[in-house]
Design a protein with these regions (language model features):
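N-terminal auxiliary segments of SAM/dcSAM-dependent transferases
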Residues: 1-105
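Conserved SAM-binding loop of SAM-dependent methyltransferases across substrates and taxa
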Residues: 152-164
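Conserved SAM-binding motif I beta-strand of class I
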Residues: 166-171
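S-adenosyl-L-methionine
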Residues: 172-210
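A short glycine-rich, Lys/Arg-flanked "PGG" loop and its adjoining helix->strand segment in the class I
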Residues: 231-245
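Conserved beta-strand signature within the Rossmann-like core of class I S-adenosyl-L-methionine
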Residues: 246-253
Length: 294
């Protein structure tokens, strides 16, 4: 299998609200009020310089990212892509579907929207807290982990934060990875302990050996006709094969159709049992099932 390279950090996506804050600090600086010299965004720490009424973020490797009024003028739901020369566009893409990085209030990690639909839980939580909740259910120090749906990489990063020694993560959509490469909160995807595979998880899992992983996090998009291949008995049997005995699986299901009496978690639980898992139950904090290979 071929690993995906996130590339070096040449451009970053900055929430418009943070751009405004940075320019405000520079105005204070011009009045002789020295602002803090360090700025943290996600997994990145920058030095702050103020040059010609622009904020210049300097990474630890020396790369420079120029934030100007154009970046600050975007709406609150937009992130500006900036590089060494300044504003380069909005953190969005269109290729059959519309993709956009959307910042959240309070400096929380941004979410990804595809055709206006959040790819993360944001009601009553935030993407990072949700990723930690999922990882904490199955990941322990030293574990080898498979994360089947990379997205912006928060779950893989959370697994490393929990002490995983190695994480393989699979993403089917290269545009999603391109946006993750811009996102400062996704920067730790470049950690040498995380290995990214561009491909269909249904096919990629067949390439792993028996008992290859200690834990598996399956966080698919909501169930639909186009994502149904991520909810099949065939795939769950592959999960059972590649997990070691005693290894745990977290499977996000959400609660779609609960009001209408539909029960996706129950259906998934039945298929997991048929695949050989013991289902330990539904974990409301993470809105998914935990199962173990006995």
């Amino acid at each position: 299998m071929e690993l995906y390279n996130m590339g070096s950090l040449r451009r970053i996506a900055v929430p418009s609200s943070i751009a405004k804050e940075l320019l405000g600090r520079c105005r204070e600086w011009s009045r002789g009020e020295r602002p803090p010299a360090k700025v943290r965004m996600g997994g990145l720490v920058f030095g702050l310089q103020c040059i010609d009424e622009r904020a210049v973020l300097v990474s630890e490797s020396g790369s420079r990212f120029v934030v100007d009024e154009h970046a600050a003028s975007l709406g609150e739901r937009s992130m500006a892509v900036v590089g060494s020369t300044g504003f380069m566009g909005v953190a969005e893409a269109y290729r059959g579907s519309y993709y956009k990085l959307v910042p959240l209030p309070g400096g929380k990690p941004p979410t990804l929207e595809i055709n206006g639909i959040h790819m993360h839980r944001v009601a009553g939580t935030d993407p990072w807290s949700d990723a930690l909740a999922k990882a904490s259910l199955v990941v322990k120090r030293g574990f080898r982990v498979l994360d089947t749906c990379t997205g912006l990489g928060y779950t893989s990063i959370a697994a490393i934060a929990r002490g995983a020694s190695l994480v393989y993560t699979v993403e089917v959509d290269e545009i999603v990875l391109q946006l993750a490469a811009l996102n400062p909160w996704s920067h730790r995807l470049r950690d040498k302990r995380i290995r990214i595979i561009l491909g269909d998880a249904v096919e990629v899992v067949r390439d792993f050996g028996d008992s290859a992983f200690d834990a598996l996090i399956h966080d698919p998009p909501r169930f639909s006709k186009s994502t149904s291949s991520l909810y099949t008995l065939e795939l769950y049997r592959e999960f059972h094969r590649i997990l070691r005995r005693g290894g745990r699986l977290f499977h996000y299901t959400g609660e779609p159709g609960r009001i209408r009496g539909l029960n996706l978690p129950g259906r998934v639980a039945r298929l997991l049992r048929e695949a050989g898992f013991e289902v330990l139950g539904f974990r409301r904090r993470a809105l998914g099932l935990v199962a173990v290979k006995m």
